[in-house]
Amino acid sequence: MKKWLVIVLIIAGIRCDGFSDQVFRTLFIGEGNACYRTFNKTHEFGCQANRENENGLIVRIDKQEDFKNLDSCWNSFYPKYSGKYWALLPVNLIRRDTISQLKSSKCLSGIVLYNSGESIHPGDESTAASHDAECPNAASDYYLQDKNEEYCERKINSRGAITRDGLMKIDWRIQMVFIDNSTDLEIIEKCYSMFNKPKEDGSSGYPYCGMSFRLANMAAGNSEICYRRGKNDAKLFQMNIDSGDAPQLCGAMHSDNIFAFPTPIPTSPTNETIITSKYMMVTARMDSFGMIPEISVGEVSVLTSIISVLAAARSMGTQIEKWQKASNTSNRNVFFAFFNGESLDYIGSGAAAYQMENGKFPQMIRSDRTHIHPIRPNELDYILEVQQIGVAKGRKYYVHVDGERYQQNKTQTDRVIDRIERGLRSHAFDLEKPSGSGDRVPPASWHSFAKADAHVQSVLLAPYGKEYEYQRVNSILDKNEWTEDEREKAIQEIEAVSTAILAAAADYVGVETDEVVAKVDKKLITTIFDCLITSNFWFDCDFMQKLDGGRYHKLFNSYGFNQKSTYISMESHTAFPTVLHWLTIFALGSDKETLNVKSEKSCSHLGQFQAFQMYTYTWQPNPYTGNFSCLKSAIVKKVMVSPAVDSQTPEEEMNTRYSTWMESVYIIESVNLYLMEDASFEYTMILIAVISALLSIFAVGRCSETTFIVDEGEPAAEGGEPL
């Protein structure tokens, strides 16, 4: 009986694991490099790991023809393998004619996305590759909520959209990971080539190279469920007894928005209720997304338009006395707004409109402090927005207005449009003007404010008419290879649009538009274009390195902190808001009144513990010289959360006209590469182990003490005699 017990214990203790558990390479995957769960009010989207999609044999899809192997589950190449696959796939093969195969495949665990290295130029029309919908932000469209249109009536992105609702609104059954590290990609490719690549006759055999990856989301369902779980009374039941903390399962998408006031109006107890002014808001969105949200540079979707606005702001900042004098006389002002989250149902502008309605924009007001005077929706005359600059077909631009509101204030609006046209024509660009009362505004920040006020007018300047010309709006592939001619034309467009912004703004506030006021700095435009667009990272150029001055630190192992990304995210782990904030301070900040301030500590004290809180003081270097100075500016950087999903919003003020996008908190693991052996190999190893154990027991059982060599002195020592 004892012998059989020994046998059982020995066999149970033997590790009979095959090669499938022998990981030979681990690749670190940072936050933002993989697909995860996102939510709106009614649905969940994105990816979730489960037992069916974690492991798989690595295969390649290098060209269109390779998708036929996906349809057959690669049976002709791996006839003895019955598991699932991880497919290496270049991003440019995500197309209209391939997306359905990826969605419906039953043999994929996931896809490993990477940039193919093929050059894509801004005017390339060969591939529809927008990851956004045919009707971007259709659910938040002013005309839909005003019951003037049906859902997605104007398919403005029909040329570029891969799917009707966009790739971010797909609930995938597979996982996705994006590999941007060339060394990691080479390791995966080498593993495939050594073990999985079929021979010339098409055959292959064990062992194979396998891959495992897991991203586990903490939340599921929709944003309504997520919102309820985020409330304090719900967190009480989730609290960790040891730490006292309630785990966050999901949260609203939010990040910094930037508002700059060249000529701010102060508040005070005596004038807070009587001052009224009119405003032109000049705006550009600062966010984009891809099918893996963070992988989104947004060159044309975001960056070129922002450069146009920054150049106009810089020109205004160098002549600020003239603008201040004109604003004081006309009681009209211009301010700049960079909204974040606009590609996801207008998160930033929706929150700003809500705050305006409640008297909290741009700052919370305290009676014992002087702030920038609150702006109300009815004080906005115009929202001048620019989009998709740098990719015009020929030299033609379009201005988009709301037809009904245009007819109500045609004379003044025509004057603004006329100044825009003059600015464009000074650089040999043409402008197509509004056609009539039936005009509708394309997706733009104006939609948020149109719901809050019946008179605010859109003046949207863009290089498209009824449909987007650029076919990669909000896409991983919104990253171009610019030839010298394409780069020069884009810079010319940015210069022309920036001049048009200045011309319209100057006429609105009553500034005499002489050559000095209307001139923009083309050299600065060229420099920022090369830094933000052609450089690999925001701080790779000399201009941005000097502007940084050692202030930027990569605090997180996230894609947005280590690569160029314009996605809004939930935790603000992206560098771009910081980059844009510093550039805006450079454009509008001044050290004329702070020349005697010689340290960062002294500079920061200027804005602290004072009753006058209208200005901020920033210790920042000059991007041309690298020398630090204390810059005074009326620039507000604030995190904006959609009122519909903000846990701080009172229940009675909740309004579903705002964005409901949220994200799940997730746990991301590394990619593991391992060797896969045939199941028969596993059984063979178990059999060998069992036989070895039995032979060992049989051999040991036949032994006695005389079988072993014993030191003759041991018995004497046991008897107490010395050795």
UniProtKB/Swiss-Prot annotation:
UniProt GO BP: cell fate commitment involved in pattern specification; egg-laying behavior; embryonic morphogenesis; nematode pharynx development; Notch receptor processing; Notch signaling pathway; protein processing
Gene Ontology cellular-component terms listed: gamma-secretase complex; plasma membrane
Primary role: Essential subunit of the gamma-secretase complex, an endoprotease complex that catalyzes the intramembrane cleavage of integral membrane proteins such as Notch (glp-1 or lin-12). It may represents a stabilizing cofactor required for the assembly of the gamma-secretase complex.
Presence of the UniProt keyword Ribonucleoprotein in the record: no
Glycosites: 40, 181, 271, 328, 409, 627
Membrane topology reported for the UniProt record: Single-pass type I membrane protein
Principal subcellular localisation of the protein: membrane
Residues in the signal sequence: 1-16
Disulfide bridge partners, by residue number: none
Topological domains, Cytoplasmic: 700-723
Protein name in the entry: Nicastrin
UniProt KW Transmembrane helix keyword: yes
Location of the protein in the cell: Membrane
Upper lineage: Eukaryota, Metazoa, Ecdysozoa, Nematoda, Chromadorea
Keywords, alphabetical: Glycoprotein, Membrane, Notch signaling pathway, Signal, Transmembrane, Transmembrane helix
Domain of life according to the entry: Eukaryota
